[in-house]
Amino acid sequence: MRPPACWWLLAPPALLALLTCSLAFGLASEDTKKEVKQSQDLEKSGISRKNDIDLKGIVFVIQSQSNSFHAKRAEQLKKSILKQAADLTQELPSVLLLHQLAKQEGAWTILPLLPHFSVTYSRNSSWIFFCEEETRIQIPKLLETLRRYDPSKEWFLGKALHDEEATIIHHYAFSENPTVFKYPDFAAGWALSIPLVNKLTKRLKSESLKSDFTIDLKHEIALYIWDKGGGPPLTPVPEFCTNDVDFYCATTFHSFLPLCRKPVKKKDIFVAVKTCKKFHGDRIPIVKQTWESQASLIEYYSDYTENSIPTVDLGIPNTDRGHCGKTFAILERFLNRSQDKTAWLVIVDDDTLISISRLQHLLSCYDSGEPVFLGERYGYGLGTGGYSYITGGGGMVFSREAVRRLLASKCRCYSNDAPDDMVLGMCFSGLGIPVTHSPLFHQARPVDYPKDYLSHQVPISFHKHWNIDPVKVYFTWLAPSDEDKARQETQKGFREEL
Protein backbone atom coordinates (compact mmCIF):
# COMPACT_ATOMS: atom_id res chain seq x y z
CA MET A 1 0.00 0.00 0.00
CA ARG A 2 1.21 3.50 -0.85
CA PRO A 3 0.63 5.44 2.41
CA PRO A 4 -1.82 8.33 2.01
CA ALA A 5 -0.57 11.83 2.66
CA CYS A 6 -2.43 12.06 5.97
CA TRP A 7 -2.42 8.38 6.90
CA TRP A 8 -2.11 9.14 10.62
CA LEU A 9 -5.47 10.86 10.53
CA LEU A 10 -6.98 7.69 9.09
CA ALA A 11 -5.44 5.07 11.36
CA PRO A 12 -7.38 4.34 14.56
CA PRO A 13 -5.70 4.15 17.97
CA ALA A 14 -5.65 0.35 17.84
CA LEU A 15 -3.25 0.43 14.92
CA LEU A 16 -1.18 3.30 16.27
CA ALA A 17 -0.63 1.39 19.44
CA LEU A 18 0.85 -1.50 17.49
CA LEU A 19 3.20 0.65 15.47
CA THR A 20 6.33 1.26 17.78
CA CYS A 21 15.10 -4.93 -20.30
CA SER A 22 15.99 -2.83 -22.60
CA LEU A 23 18.13 0.29 -22.20
CA ALA A 24 21.74 -0.78 -22.21
CA PHE A 25 24.50 0.73 -20.16
CA GLY A 26 25.99 1.95 -23.39
CA LEU A 27 23.33 4.67 -23.76
CA ALA A 28 25.29 6.61 -21.17
CA SER A 29 28.63 5.62 -22.70
CA GLU A 30 29.92 9.17 -23.14
CA ASP A 31 29.51 9.92 -19.44
CA THR A 32 31.03 6.57 -18.59
CA LYS A 33 34.04 7.16 -20.84
CA LYS A 34 34.67 10.50 -19.14
CA GLU A 35 34.43 8.90 -15.72
CA VAL A 36 36.76 6.06 -16.71
CA LYS A 37 39.30 8.51 -18.15
CA GLN A 38 39.19 10.52 -14.92
CA SER A 39 39.76 7.28 -13.01
CA GLN A 40 42.72 6.36 -15.19
CA ASP A 41 44.20 9.84 -14.83
CA LEU A 42 43.98 9.49 -11.05
CA GLU A 43 45.78 6.16 -11.22
CA LYS A 44 48.56 7.62 -13.39
CA SER A 45 49.00 10.47 -10.91
CA GLY A 46 50.02 8.02 -8.19
CA ILE A 47 47.07 8.78 -5.91
CA SER A 48 46.07 5.12 -5.83
CA ARG A 49 49.44 4.13 -4.39
CA LYS A 50 49.17 6.75 -1.66
CA ASN A 51 45.85 5.24 -0.52
CA ASP A 52 47.16 1.69 -0.47
CA ILE A 53 44.80 -0.71 1.30
CA ASP A 54 44.56 -4.46 1.44
CA LEU A 55 41.51 -6.67 1.62
CA LYS A 56 41.60 -6.70 5.41
CA GLY A 57 40.66 -3.03 5.24
CA ILE A 58 37.35 -3.76 3.49
CA VAL A 59 34.31 -5.11 5.33
CA PHE A 60 31.91 -6.75 2.87
CA VAL A 61 28.22 -6.64 3.77
CA ILE A 62 25.92 -8.74 1.59
CA GLN A 63 22.34 -7.41 1.72
CA SER A 64 20.98 -10.90 2.29
CA GLN A 65 17.61 -12.28 3.40
CA SER A 66 16.71 -15.15 5.70
CA ASN A 67 14.58 -17.07 3.18
CA SER A 68 16.43 -20.30 2.35
CA PHE A 69 16.87 -19.49 -1.35
CA HIS A 70 18.29 -16.03 -0.70
CA ALA A 71 20.48 -17.17 2.20
CA LYS A 72 22.02 -19.83 -0.05
CA ARG A 73 22.78 -17.31 -2.80
CA ALA A 74 24.40 -14.99 -0.27
CA GLU A 75 26.55 -17.82 1.10
CA GLN A 76 27.73 -18.59 -2.43
CA LEU A 77 28.78 -14.97 -2.94
CA LYS A 78 30.59 -15.01 0.41
CA LYS A 79 32.54 -18.11 -0.67
CA SER A 80 33.47 -16.40 -3.95
CA ILE A 81 34.82 -13.34 -2.14
CA LEU A 82 36.85 -15.43 0.30
CA LYS A 83 38.22 -17.66 -2.47
CA GLN A 84 39.38 -14.64 -4.46
CA ALA A 85 41.04 -13.26 -1.34
CA ALA A 86 42.80 -16.57 -0.72
CA ASP A 87 43.98 -16.68 -4.34
CA LEU A 88 45.56 -13.26 -3.79
CA THR A 89 47.31 -14.73 -0.72
CA GLN A 90 45.90 -11.88 1.37
CA GLU A 91 44.49 -12.08 4.86
CA LEU A 92 40.80 -12.90 4.55
CA PRO A 93 38.40 -9.96 4.89
CA SER A 94 35.25 -9.85 7.00
CA VAL A 95 32.23 -10.90 4.92
CA LEU A 96 28.93 -10.33 6.71
CA LEU A 97 25.42 -11.47 5.80
CA LEU A 98 22.94 -8.75 6.67
CA HIS A 99 20.19 -11.09 7.84
CA GLN A 100 22.57 -12.67 10.36
CA LEU A 101 23.80 -9.40 11.86
CA ALA A 102 20.78 -8.50 13.94
CA LYS A 103 17.41 -9.91 14.84
CA GLN A 104 15.74 -6.51 14.72
CA GLU A 105 13.06 -6.08 12.06
CA GLY A 106 14.71 -3.09 10.42
CA ALA A 107 18.23 -4.46 9.92
CA TRP A 108 17.67 -4.45 6.14
CA THR A 109 17.42 -0.65 6.22
CA ILE A 110 21.15 -0.58 7.15
CA LEU A 111 21.22 2.77 8.98
CA PRO A 112 20.38 1.15 12.37
CA LEU A 113 23.47 -1.07 11.96
CA LEU A 114 25.98 1.74 11.38
CA PRO A 115 26.80 2.12 15.11
CA HIS A 116 27.71 -1.58 15.18
CA PHE A 117 29.99 -1.14 12.16
CA SER A 118 31.59 1.91 13.75
CA VAL A 119 32.34 0.20 17.07
CA THR A 120 33.47 -3.10 15.57
CA TYR A 121 35.45 -2.09 12.50
CA SER A 122 36.57 1.55 12.74
CA ARG A 123 40.00 0.74 14.21
CA ASN A 124 41.25 -1.68 11.57
CA SER A 125 39.11 -1.05 8.47
CA SER A 126 38.85 1.66 5.84
CA TRP A 127 35.66 0.78 3.96
CA ILE A 128 32.27 -0.86 4.38
CA PHE A 129 31.31 -2.27 0.98
CA PHE A 130 27.65 -3.25 0.50
CA CYS A 131 26.29 -5.42 -2.31
CA GLU A 132 23.33 -7.58 -3.24
CA GLU A 133 23.44 -11.37 -3.31
CA GLU A 134 23.57 -11.39 -7.13
CA THR A 135 26.32 -8.75 -7.40
CA ARG A 136 29.48 -10.24 -8.87
CA ILE A 137 32.76 -8.79 -7.63
CA GLN A 138 36.23 -8.82 -9.17
CA ILE A 139 38.28 -8.41 -6.00
CA PRO A 140 41.58 -7.22 -7.60
CA LYS A 141 39.71 -4.56 -9.60
CA LEU A 142 37.74 -3.49 -6.52
CA LEU A 143 40.97 -2.99 -4.57
CA GLU A 144 42.42 -0.99 -7.45
CA THR A 145 39.29 1.17 -7.59
CA LEU A 146 39.05 1.93 -3.87
CA ARG A 147 42.73 2.92 -3.74
CA ARG A 148 41.84 6.05 -5.71
CA TYR A 149 39.92 7.46 -2.76
CA ASP A 150 41.57 8.73 0.41
CA PRO A 151 40.06 6.56 3.17
CA SER A 152 40.70 9.23 5.79
CA LYS A 153 37.99 11.37 4.18
CA GLU A 154 34.21 10.98 4.04
CA TRP A 155 33.22 9.06 0.91
CA PHE A 156 29.89 7.75 -0.34
CA LEU A 157 30.60 5.73 -3.49
CA GLY A 158 28.31 3.96 -5.93
CA LYS A 159 26.82 3.70 -9.39
CA ALA A 160 24.65 6.80 -9.70
CA LEU A 161 20.95 6.68 -10.47
CA HIS A 162 18.69 9.71 -10.79
CA ASP A 163 14.98 10.23 -11.36
CA GLU A 164 13.87 11.01 -14.89
CA GLU A 165 10.92 13.00 -13.53
CA ALA A 166 9.50 13.80 -10.11
CA THR A 167 7.97 10.60 -8.77
CA ILE A 168 5.50 9.65 -6.09
CA ILE A 169 7.78 6.94 -4.64
CA HIS A 170 10.26 9.70 -3.73
CA HIS A 171 7.55 12.10 -2.53
CA TYR A 172 8.22 14.27 -5.62
CA ALA A 173 11.61 15.29 -4.22
CA PHE A 174 13.69 17.72 -6.31
CA SER A 175 10.64 18.33 -8.49
CA GLU A 176 12.22 21.35 -10.22
CA ASN A 177 15.13 19.22 -11.46
CA PRO A 178 14.85 15.53 -10.49
CA THR A 179 18.13 14.65 -12.24
CA VAL A 180 20.21 16.69 -9.81
CA PHE A 181 20.06 14.21 -6.92
CA LYS A 182 22.06 11.00 -7.30
CA TYR A 183 21.53 7.80 -5.34
CA PRO A 184 23.21 4.38 -5.59
CA ASP A 185 22.12 1.34 -7.53
CA PHE A 186 22.52 -1.34 -4.87
CA ALA A 187 22.96 -4.03 -7.55
CA ALA A 188 26.33 -2.52 -8.51
CA GLY A 189 27.57 -2.34 -4.93
CA TRP A 190 28.19 0.80 -2.90
CA ALA A 191 30.70 1.86 -0.27
CA LEU A 192 31.05 4.09 2.78
CA SER A 193 34.41 5.16 4.15
CA ILE A 194 34.88 4.56 7.87
CA PRO A 195 35.09 8.32 8.68
CA LEU A 196 31.63 8.73 7.13
CA VAL A 197 30.31 5.70 9.05
CA ASN A 198 31.62 7.28 12.26
CA LYS A 199 30.03 10.63 11.44
CA LEU A 200 26.67 9.04 10.68
CA THR A 201 26.89 7.03 13.90
CA LYS A 202 27.29 10.22 15.94
CA ARG A 203 24.26 11.68 14.22
CA LEU A 204 22.21 8.54 14.85
CA LYS A 205 23.08 8.70 18.54
CA SER A 206 22.09 12.35 18.85
CA GLU A 207 18.87 12.16 16.82
CA SER A 208 16.91 8.93 16.44
CA LEU A 209 15.62 7.83 13.07
CA LYS A 210 12.16 9.12 12.28
CA SER A 211 9.33 6.64 12.68
CA ASP A 212 7.88 6.77 9.19
CA PHE A 213 7.73 4.82 5.96
CA THR A 214 10.61 3.11 4.17
CA ILE A 215 9.67 2.97 0.49
CA ASP A 216 12.82 3.16 -1.67
CA LEU A 217 15.78 2.43 0.59
CA LYS A 218 18.55 3.43 -1.81
CA HIS A 219 17.04 6.89 -2.29
CA GLU A 220 16.31 7.34 1.41
CA ILE A 221 19.84 6.35 2.46
CA ALA A 222 21.30 8.85 -0.02
CA LEU A 223 19.03 11.59 1.36
CA TYR A 224 20.06 10.78 4.93
CA ILE A 225 23.77 10.85 4.10
CA TRP A 226 23.48 14.06 2.07
CA ASP A 227 21.61 15.67 4.99
CA LYS A 228 20.40 18.68 2.97
CA GLY A 229 23.97 19.56 2.06
CA GLY A 230 25.50 18.82 5.43
CA GLY A 231 26.96 15.53 4.24
CA PRO A 232 28.61 14.22 1.09
CA PRO A 233 26.65 13.53 -2.08
CA LEU A 234 27.11 10.25 -3.89
CA THR A 235 30.37 10.04 -5.84
CA PRO A 236 29.77 8.07 -9.07
CA VAL A 237 32.24 5.22 -9.60
CA PRO A 238 32.34 3.96 -13.21
CA GLU A 239 33.85 0.63 -12.15
CA PHE A 240 30.67 -0.20 -10.21
CA CYS A 241 28.63 -1.71 -13.05
CA THR A 242 25.33 -3.45 -13.71
CA ASN A 243 25.98 -4.33 -17.35
CA ASP A 244 27.67 -7.47 -18.64
CA VAL A 245 31.30 -8.06 -17.79
CA ASP A 246 33.54 -5.29 -19.09
CA PHE A 247 37.27 -4.78 -18.76
CA TYR A 248 36.99 -1.81 -16.42
CA CYS A 249 34.26 -3.18 -14.10
CA ALA A 250 34.96 -4.11 -10.49
CA THR A 251 31.36 -5.26 -10.10
CA THR A 252 28.75 -6.62 -12.49
CA PHE A 253 25.14 -7.73 -12.24
CA HIS A 254 23.47 -10.18 -14.60
CA SER A 255 19.93 -9.63 -15.84
CA PHE A 256 18.03 -12.89 -15.59
CA LEU A 257 15.11 -14.44 -13.82
CA PRO A 258 16.08 -17.05 -11.25
CA LEU A 259 15.09 -20.54 -12.36
CA CYS A 260 16.03 -23.19 -9.82
CA ARG A 261 13.86 -26.06 -11.03
CA LYS A 262 11.15 -26.40 -13.64
CA PRO A 263 8.83 -23.37 -13.65
CA VAL A 264 5.91 -23.71 -11.26
CA LYS A 265 2.85 -24.94 -13.14
CA LYS A 266 0.03 -22.48 -13.80
CA LYS A 267 -2.39 -24.78 -12.00
CA ASP A 268 -0.31 -24.31 -8.85
CA ILE A 269 -0.83 -20.52 -8.81
CA PHE A 270 -4.20 -19.07 -7.83
CA VAL A 271 -4.66 -15.40 -8.76
CA ALA A 272 -7.10 -13.21 -6.84
CA VAL A 273 -7.97 -9.82 -8.33
CA LYS A 274 -9.46 -7.24 -5.95
CA THR A 275 -11.97 -4.98 -7.67
CA CYS A 276 -15.28 -3.20 -7.13
CA LYS A 277 -18.30 -2.29 -9.24
CA LYS A 278 -17.07 1.17 -10.24
CA PHE A 279 -13.98 -0.33 -11.93
CA HIS A 280 -15.69 -3.22 -13.72
CA GLY A 281 -15.99 -1.19 -16.92
CA ASP A 282 -12.50 0.32 -17.24
CA ARG A 283 -9.93 -1.71 -15.30
CA ILE A 284 -11.17 -5.28 -15.77
CA PRO A 285 -11.11 -5.04 -19.60
CA ILE A 286 -7.42 -4.11 -19.34
CA VAL A 287 -6.71 -7.26 -17.32
CA LYS A 288 -8.54 -9.33 -19.93
CA GLN A 289 -6.63 -7.68 -22.81
CA THR A 290 -3.27 -8.28 -21.18
CA TRP A 291 -2.35 -10.93 -18.63
CA GLU A 292 -5.58 -12.80 -17.76
CA SER A 293 -4.96 -15.52 -20.36
CA GLN A 294 -1.68 -16.43 -18.66
CA ALA A 295 -3.48 -17.39 -15.45
CA SER A 296 -4.98 -20.86 -15.19
CA LEU A 297 -6.80 -20.15 -11.91
CA ILE A 298 -8.17 -16.62 -11.51
CA GLU A 299 -11.12 -15.03 -9.73
CA TYR A 300 -12.29 -11.43 -9.50
CA TYR A 301 -13.49 -10.41 -6.03
CA SER A 302 -15.92 -7.51 -5.93
CA ASP A 303 -18.76 -5.95 -3.97
CA TYR A 304 -21.12 -6.74 -6.83
CA THR A 305 -21.82 -9.93 -8.79
CA GLU A 306 -21.43 -9.49 -12.54
CA ASN A 307 -21.63 -12.74 -14.47
CA SER A 308 -20.08 -11.38 -17.66
CA ILE A 309 -16.68 -11.01 -15.94
CA PRO A 310 -17.48 -13.06 -13.75
CA THR A 311 -17.02 -11.61 -10.27
CA VAL A 312 -17.40 -13.17 -6.84
CA ASP A 313 -19.16 -11.15 -4.16
CA LEU A 314 -17.50 -12.01 -0.85
CA GLY A 315 -20.15 -10.20 1.15
CA ILE A 316 -17.66 -7.52 2.21
CA PRO A 317 -18.81 -3.95 1.50
CA ASN A 318 -16.48 -1.95 -0.72
CA THR A 319 -14.27 0.60 1.01
CA ASP A 320 -12.50 3.60 -0.48
CA ARG A 321 -9.21 2.53 1.12
CA GLY A 322 -7.64 -0.35 3.00
CA HIS A 323 -9.61 -3.41 1.79
CA CYS A 324 -8.41 -5.52 4.74
CA GLY A 325 -11.74 -7.29 5.18
CA LYS A 326 -11.81 -8.29 1.52
CA THR A 327 -8.21 -9.54 1.59
CA PHE A 328 -8.72 -11.73 4.65
CA ALA A 329 -11.90 -13.16 3.08
CA ILE A 330 -9.81 -14.06 0.02
CA LEU A 331 -7.23 -15.76 2.26
CA GLU A 332 -9.96 -17.79 3.99
CA ARG A 333 -11.51 -18.79 0.65
CA PHE A 334 -8.11 -19.87 -0.71
CA LEU A 335 -7.26 -22.04 2.29
CA ASN A 336 -10.70 -23.62 2.54
CA ARG A 337 -11.18 -24.53 -1.13
CA SER A 338 -11.92 -28.25 -0.79
CA GLN A 339 -11.32 -29.20 -4.41
CA ASP A 340 -7.61 -28.39 -4.52
CA LYS A 341 -4.51 -27.63 -2.51
CA THR A 342 -3.02 -24.96 -4.75
CA ALA A 343 0.53 -24.16 -3.63
CA TRP A 344 0.59 -20.41 -4.25
CA LEU A 345 -1.79 -17.46 -3.90
CA VAL A 346 -1.23 -14.13 -5.65
CA ILE A 347 -3.38 -11.14 -4.66
CA VAL A 348 -3.31 -8.16 -7.03
CA ASP A 349 -5.25 -4.95 -7.56
CA ASP A 350 -7.40 -4.48 -10.64
CA ASP A 351 -4.83 -1.97 -11.95
CA THR A 352 -1.83 -4.26 -11.40
CA LEU A 353 -0.01 -5.40 -14.54
CA ILE A 354 1.78 -8.72 -14.00
CA SER A 355 3.67 -11.41 -15.92
CA ILE A 356 2.42 -14.80 -14.76
CA SER A 357 4.99 -16.65 -16.90
CA ARG A 358 7.87 -14.83 -15.21
CA LEU A 359 6.30 -15.43 -11.83
CA GLN A 360 6.26 -19.16 -12.65
CA HIS A 361 10.04 -18.99 -13.15
CA LEU A 362 10.67 -17.00 -9.99
CA LEU A 363 8.59 -19.26 -7.77
CA SER A 364 10.66 -22.28 -8.83
CA CYS A 365 13.24 -21.00 -6.34
CA TYR A 366 10.89 -20.99 -3.36
CA ASP A 367 9.44 -23.83 -1.30
CA SER A 368 5.67 -23.59 -0.87
CA GLY A 369 6.08 -25.79 2.20
CA GLU A 370 7.84 -22.86 3.87
CA PRO A 371 5.92 -19.74 4.99
CA VAL A 372 6.76 -17.43 2.08
CA PHE A 373 5.34 -13.89 1.82
CA LEU A 374 6.89 -12.35 -1.30
CA GLY A 375 6.78 -9.05 -3.20
CA GLU A 376 8.14 -5.51 -2.98
CA ARG A 377 9.11 -4.77 0.61
CA TYR A 378 8.23 -1.52 2.37
CA GLY A 379 8.65 -0.68 6.03
CA TYR A 380 6.87 1.28 8.71
CA GLY A 381 8.51 2.69 11.85
CA LEU A 382 11.58 0.49 11.45
CA GLY A 383 13.76 2.94 13.34
CA THR A 384 11.63 2.45 16.44
CA GLY A 385 10.56 -1.19 16.37
CA GLY A 386 8.01 -1.21 13.55
CA TYR A 387 7.58 -3.84 10.85
CA SER A 388 8.14 -4.67 7.19
CA TYR A 389 5.33 -5.39 4.76
CA ILE A 390 4.73 -6.30 1.11
CA THR A 391 3.13 -3.36 -0.67
CA GLY A 392 -0.10 -4.52 -2.27
CA GLY A 393 -0.07 -2.71 -5.62
CA GLY A 394 2.84 -4.70 -7.03
CA GLY A 395 1.22 -7.97 -6.04
CA MET A 396 1.45 -10.05 -2.85
CA VAL A 397 2.52 -13.69 -3.17
CA PHE A 398 1.73 -16.20 -0.41
CA SER A 399 2.72 -19.83 -0.05
CA ARG A 400 -0.07 -22.06 1.23
CA GLU A 401 1.92 -22.59 4.42
CA ALA A 402 2.13 -18.83 5.02
CA VAL A 403 -1.66 -18.51 4.65
CA ARG A 404 -2.20 -21.50 6.96
CA ARG A 405 -0.04 -20.05 9.73
CA LEU A 406 -1.55 -16.61 9.37
CA LEU A 407 -5.14 -17.80 9.65
CA ALA A 408 -4.26 -20.18 12.50
CA SER A 409 -3.20 -17.10 14.48
CA LYS A 410 -5.62 -14.63 16.02
CA CYS A 411 -4.26 -11.73 13.97
CA ARG A 412 -7.04 -10.09 11.98
CA CYS A 413 -8.18 -6.72 10.63
CA TYR A 414 -9.31 -4.15 13.17
CA SER A 415 -11.75 -2.89 10.51
CA ASN A 416 -12.72 -3.75 6.93
CA ASP A 417 -11.05 -0.59 5.63
CA ALA A 418 -7.73 -1.08 7.44
CA PRO A 419 -4.69 -1.09 5.09
CA ASP A 420 -4.51 -4.77 4.21
CA ASP A 421 -0.83 -4.91 3.27
CA MET A 422 0.24 -3.18 6.48
CA VAL A 423 -1.96 -5.36 8.68
CA LEU A 424 -0.51 -8.43 6.96
CA GLY A 425 2.98 -7.10 7.65
CA MET A 426 2.14 -6.65 11.34
CA CYS A 427 0.66 -10.13 11.52
CA PHE A 428 3.59 -11.89 9.89
CA SER A 429 6.03 -9.88 12.01
CA GLY A 430 4.21 -11.03 15.13
CA LEU A 431 4.45 -14.62 13.91
CA GLY A 432 8.18 -14.29 13.33
CA ILE A 433 7.77 -14.81 9.57
CA PRO A 434 9.93 -12.32 7.63
CA VAL A 435 8.70 -10.84 4.38
CA THR A 436 10.81 -11.73 1.34
CA HIS A 437 11.74 -8.87 -0.97
CA SER A 438 12.00 -9.04 -4.74
CA PRO A 439 12.83 -5.83 -6.66
CA LEU A 440 11.09 -7.34 -9.70
CA PHE A 441 7.69 -6.36 -8.24
CA HIS A 442 6.86 -2.66 -8.60
CA GLN A 443 4.33 -0.54 -6.74
CA ALA A 444 4.46 2.18 -9.40
CA ARG A 445 4.65 2.65 -13.19
CA PRO A 446 7.81 2.19 -15.32
CA VAL A 447 8.13 5.97 -15.71
CA ASP A 448 8.52 6.25 -11.94
CA TYR A 449 11.86 4.39 -11.97
CA PRO A 450 15.25 5.33 -13.48
CA LYS A 451 15.80 3.81 -16.91
CA ASP A 452 19.21 2.55 -15.85
CA TYR A 453 17.66 0.75 -12.88
CA LEU A 454 15.05 -1.04 -14.99
CA SER A 455 17.64 -1.90 -17.66
CA HIS A 456 19.10 -4.72 -15.55
CA GLN A 457 15.75 -6.15 -14.47
CA VAL A 458 13.31 -8.69 -15.86
CA PRO A 459 10.25 -7.14 -14.20
CA ILE A 460 7.33 -9.16 -12.92
CA SER A 461 4.82 -6.40 -12.18
CA PHE A 462 3.95 -2.72 -12.35
CA HIS A 463 1.01 -0.84 -10.87
CA LYS A 464 -1.33 2.06 -11.74
CA HIS A 465 -2.90 3.16 -15.02
CA TRP A 466 -2.52 6.89 -14.32
CA ASN A 467 -1.28 8.92 -17.33
CA ILE A 468 -0.10 5.83 -19.22
CA ASP A 469 -1.43 3.37 -21.79
CA PRO A 470 -1.55 0.23 -19.61
CA VAL A 471 -1.90 -2.14 -22.58
CA LYS A 472 1.21 -0.66 -24.19
CA VAL A 473 3.09 -0.84 -20.88
CA TYR A 474 2.18 -4.51 -20.52
CA PHE A 475 3.31 -5.49 -24.00
CA THR A 476 6.48 -3.40 -23.71
CA TRP A 477 7.60 -4.59 -20.29
CA LEU A 478 5.79 -7.76 -19.23
CA ALA A 479 4.42 -9.83 -22.12
CA PRO A 480 6.12 -13.19 -22.81
CA SER A 481 8.72 -12.68 -25.54
CA ASP A 482 11.53 -14.32 -27.49
CA GLU A 483 13.90 -12.41 -25.23
CA ASP A 484 12.51 -14.33 -22.25
CA LYS A 485 13.23 -17.60 -24.07
CA ALA A 486 16.77 -16.47 -24.88
CA ARG A 487 17.50 -16.15 -21.18
CA GLN A 488 17.07 -19.89 -20.67
CA GLU A 489 20.76 -20.59 -21.31
CA THR A 490 21.75 -18.11 -18.61
CA GLN A 491 19.26 -19.70 -16.26
CA LYS A 492 20.72 -23.16 -16.89
CA GLY A 493 24.02 -21.86 -15.55
CA PHE A 494 22.19 -20.43 -12.56
CA ARG A 495 20.65 -23.84 -11.79
CA GLU A 496 24.08 -25.45 -11.98
CA GLU A 497 25.41 -22.96 -9.40
CA LEU A 498 22.61 -23.98 -7.05
Swiss-Prot record:
UniProt motif Prevents secretion from ER: location: 495-498
GO biological process: brain development; camera-type eye development; cilium assembly; cranial skeletal system development; fucose metabolic process; gene expression; limb development; protein O-linked fucosylation
Gene3D superfamilies: 3.90.550.50
This enzyme's EC code(s): 2.4.1.-
Tissue specificity field: Widely expressed, with highest levels in testis and uterus.
Pathway listed: Protein modification; protein glycosylation
Membrane-side (Lumenal) residue stretches: 28-498
Residues with attached carbohydrate: 336
Keywords tagged on the record: Carbohydrate metabolism, Congenital disorder of glycosylation, Dwarfism, Endoplasmic reticulum, Fucose metabolism, Glycoprotein, Glycosyltransferase, Membrane, Signal-anchor, Transferase, Transmembrane, Transmembrane helix
Record field: transmembrane: 7-27
UniProt topology in membrane: Single-pass type II membrane protein
An example Gene Ontology CC term for this record: endoplasmic reticulum membrane
Uppermost EC category: transferase
Any Pfam family matching the protein: Fringe
Cellular localisation: Endoplasmic reticulum membrane
Illness association: Peters-plus syndrome: An autosomal recessive disorder characterized by anterior eye-chamber abnormalities, disproportionate short stature, developmental delay, characteristic craniofacial features, cleft lip and/or palate.
Family: Belongs to the glycosyltransferase 31 family.
Its biological purpose: O-glucosyltransferase that transfers glucose toward fucose with a beta-1,3 linkage. Specifically glucosylates O-linked fucosylglycan on TSP type-1 domains of proteins, thereby contributing to elongation of O-fucosylglycan.
Cited PANTHER family: FRINGE-RELATED
Designated name of the protein: Beta-1,3-glucosyltransferase
